Amino acid sequence: ERANHLETLYIPFVDIEGEQSGAVEDDTEKPQITAYEVWKRGRAAGLVDTDTARAAFFTQNFADDYTLQLAPELYVKVDAASCRVKETEKIGVGGLTEQIVAVTVTGEGEILSGTVSASEKEQLLNTRMEDYLNAIAAHALEKEIDITNSYRNLGADNRTWYFKYQNTPAAYEKDIKIQYLVKINWKSE
């Protein structure tokens, strides 16, 4: 446990789902991952949905590929992705300094279903993916969960932030904002 005390861990929550096929009830039950228990600083921090956990795995480069729904009929898959996390500051509203955890996503992508015009494919898909990931990250931060797991690397990545937050990791999760920049090369059909 001590080795993971700075990590944000996602533990699968498995539930047994009954299945029905046609008019006859099938008595087979199938285990399914329905959520993930978040474990941080040695304590349970609550449940998150599977989309949030998958986004965290992807952001931390633990997923070989990532399939997601960007619109009602638009499914995409990203392969060979790399997510680079960098802590930075910018002047925000009212001249206040905002602490930004910027995530740059690169890789190859393809449309699994749905259509997008060739002229707007690259920009539209990247923007939709940014919006999707930014929404998930913002929702997780409302629960004080950093899906980038960036706190664990502050000592090496940003010494100023490290000294500021070394004894107050909960304040770090309240103060940061996560922003994604997606630069996926989308394959042509």
Role assignments for model-derived ranges:
Residues 1-189:
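Membrane-proximal alpha-helical signals and transmembrane carboxylates
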